[in-house]
Design a protein with these regions (language model features):
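Conserved Walker A/P-loop ATP-binding site and its immediately adjacent core
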Residues: 277, 291-308
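Conserved pre-motif I regulatory segment
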Residues: 17-20, 27, 39, 45, ...
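Accessory nucleic-acid engagement/destabilization modules that flank
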Residues: 1-13, 17-230
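Conserved phosphate/pyrophosphate-binding and hydrolysis machinery centered on Walker-type P-loop NTPases
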Residues: 14-18, 40, 176-180, 238, ...
Length: 308
């Protein structure tokens, strides 16, 4: 059996299906490590293009035909078929991975429609899904992943899902399901980003980005925090409002230095320097914790528009 491809450059150089699948698995797993589901992410990345392991899809890739072929459903269907008769933890893992795979080109769907119908299961059983399924699975398990590896990965992924569910500290079903939906969204986003990143790097002849280590991230926060401090220190102190803004900003910095992570509120009148005071707090907290991200949310409309 000839080696299947995932992408082809204008120069007719090709990226193998196996290389793309492994690269996406690595990137997706690395991203999902931060929420404790590294193997869930790796499994989703590895299976996401299972449907490309079919002669019809390969012909489309080589010849750039206009035929529309569904290559996303094969991996979605396989992971579900392998686990739907097992324990609830296996079924939950399979649902999460299945939905991320099936939607990685179309956008995340609902498990259940407003009418209470499970449209995703209808998709698994659709005629278009069936056409490519058997051939794709057989070829994929020969070229990209063995059954033994798949079994081991699924077991590790289930262990992560069990730990995740136990860590959702609430007895309220609505909140628990919301938490799981956030995991679903995270996995979906990680998979799409990993897929696009590997595709872009290959097509542009670039190396895949290396994961940022703790030391590198700490150096970034140190630089950013110092930049914010220098920027704020350069403000003139001409008027009483300048002194008050500085006082508020210093209090925010003090809170960041004396406290650990948590939820904090800042109540300051309009014009009191909330934006920069909050940024200063945020940078120092991120520096202390060597955080992975800082998210900044701003109003859709300006403050003056909201108050008018």
């Amino acid at each position: 059996m000839k080696e299947f491809i995932a992408h082809i450059r204008e120069s007719r150089e090709v990226q193998s299906h196996q290389d793309h699948s492994r690269n996406v698995a690595k990137l997706c797993g690395e991203a999902c490590k931060s929420i404790g589901v590294e193997h869930v992410g790796y499994l989703a990345g590895l299976l996401h293009d299972m449907g490309k392991a079919h002669e019809k899809v390969q012909n489309h890739l080589w010849n750039q035909t206009s035929e529309k072929l569904n290559h996303a459903t094969a991996g979605m269907r396989w992971i579900w078929n392998e686990n739907k008769q097992k324990k609830p933890s296996y079924k939950l893992m399979a649902q999460i991975v299945s939905m991320a795979i099936g939607c990685h080109h179309s956008g995340l769907d609902n498990f259940i429609s407003p009418k209470g119908e499970e449209d995703w299961e209808k998709r698994l059983a659709s005629e278009t899904a069936q056409q490519l399924y058997e051939g794709s699975v057989k070829a994929f398990l020969e070229q990209c992943m063995s059954v033994e590896e798949a079994t081991e990965l699924m077991h590790k992924a289930v262990t992560e899902v069990i730990t995740l569910v136990k860590g959702i500290n609430t007895e309220e079903a609505t909140l628990a399901f919301f938490a799981l939906s956030m995991v679903q969204r995270f996995l979906f986003g990680a998979l799409v980003d990993a897929d696009w990143t590997d595709t872009k790097c290959y097509m542009n002849g670039e190396k895949l980005p290396e994961p940022v280590c703790d030391q590198q991230r700490q150096e970034v926060w140190n630089r950013l925090s110092e930049s914010v401090e220098q920027y704020i220190a350069a403000f003139p102190q001409k008027y009483a409002i300048d002194a008050e803004r500085t006082r508020i900003s210093n209090l925010c910095l003090q809170v960041a230095e004396q406290n650990d992570r948590g939820i904090y509120r800042l109540y300051v009148p309009t014009g009191g320097g909330k934006t920069l005071a909050g940024l200063r707090f945020c940078m120092r907290m991120a520096q202390k914790q060597n955080a992975q991200h800082v998210f900044y949310f701003s109003p859709y409309k300006s403050i003056t528009t909201q108050n008018s």
